[in-house]
């Protein structure tokens, strides 16, 4: 939790600087490439982090680098939405991509379970001793990241550079001034800080809550993760359609209301069956919230 929190703070600081620099220089794809490479290396190097106290600091450092790079990847990745969509279908394309991402996450999780977690014998004669099953998952996920990033680098053109003569810092300050002058936009960015932190908390501690309060087994926690991803994928897909019809602001408001309602239900119930239903509802509203947040930024930022 602490690692995720620190990474979130650094993302809030580095994200605007990185975005301004890559936009001004016209190197969004190149920036994304280096971030993916860093994420790949940091995640794959977790293979060497054995369940032993002497590897604790090693695991913390590379886990932190992996998480931070993944967070920053989204900064460059989200900025490419305009290159693969038109103004009239931002919502549909964003929703479809979030849906695909969730399905990809589910697929990666299932493959890890089938290949490394459930079997008694692992591929390539890897031993389960010293956490070989979990460490193998780190290598697999790092390769998964590289493979499914390739279409971006092969088929999407580099966006045109911003022709402003201002340096990166002044360009960034100008962006902040635009935000502060627009009260509605300023309120949104403040709200975004809170609700995105809430989403990070949900993903980080959802499984812990299920384990401690409802006594979920490790297998049930995995099913819980799959359920959340399926419902979020469905919500993102449908939310993209409504985004183009109603606008991202309305979808965001509806999604936040749905998450709050589902969260309250989760806190009040004590039956497992109801927990599953409320969790599905929670995930269903998380998907469109993430998708429409990207669309809104795409529309309001030049």
Please report, for each region that a protein language model flagged, where it lies by residue:
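Helix-loop junctions at membrane interfaces in 12-TM secondary transporters
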Residues: 47-62, 267-279
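Helix-to-loop junctions at the C-terminal end of transmembrane segments
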Residues: 13-27, 235-248
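Glycine-rich segments within core transmembrane alpha-helices of 12-TM secondary carriers
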Residues: 94-116
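Intracellular juxtamembrane helix-capping segments at the cytosolic ends
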Residues: 71-85, 288-302
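Short amphipathic helix-loop junctions that connect adjacent transmembrane helices
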Residues: 1, 204-221
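Juxtamembrane intracellular "pre-TM" segments in multi-pass secondary transporters
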Residues: 157-190
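Structural signature of the two symmetry-related core transmembrane helices
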Residues: 30-45, 250-265
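C-terminal membrane-cytosol helix-exit motif in multi-pass small-molecule transporters
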Residues: 108-121, 142-161
